[in-house]
Amino acid sequence: FDYIIIDLGRSLSRISLPIIQKSDLLILILGTDQGTVTITKSVTEYLKTLGIDLKKLYLILNRAIGLEGITKTDAEKILDLDIKMTMPYMGGNFTTANNQSQPITHKFPNDTGAFMLRSLAKNIIEETR
């Protein structure tokens, strides 16, 4: 396979750590609440102690609840890392597409979120070349 995507959820375990260590790119999706950003900082510091090059991280700030919460700039300052992309709040479009078992990029192709997801896919491919 050219690409293998594994969703490791929220845990670091004896099973997930070797996968993380062998990965070419690690995508971390974080929310806009202070607690999530703080935990992400702890995780990135831990990954660094394992010898993982933090340049392999591709951070995405997910605005799942609108404009509330921490800004991209503030999150980058806390993390001392660049956030590569911010996913916009998609309102009810995401839920509608999900409930109808349709990709958001097909159900709402002109939605800003759909555009960002297509851009994300392109950027990830470029990052791994």
Region roles according to the model:
Residues 99-129:
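NTP-binding/hydrolysis catalytic cores, primarily Walker-type P-loop NTPases
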Residues 23-25, 53-57:
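Short glycine-/polar-rich loops that comprise or flank the Walker A/P-loop
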Residues 40-54:
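Conserved C-terminal guanine-recognition region of P-loop GTPase G domains, centered on the G4
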Residues 3, 25, 81-85:
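Well-ordered beta-strand positions
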Residues 2, 10-34:
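Inter-motif core of Ras-like GTPase G domains
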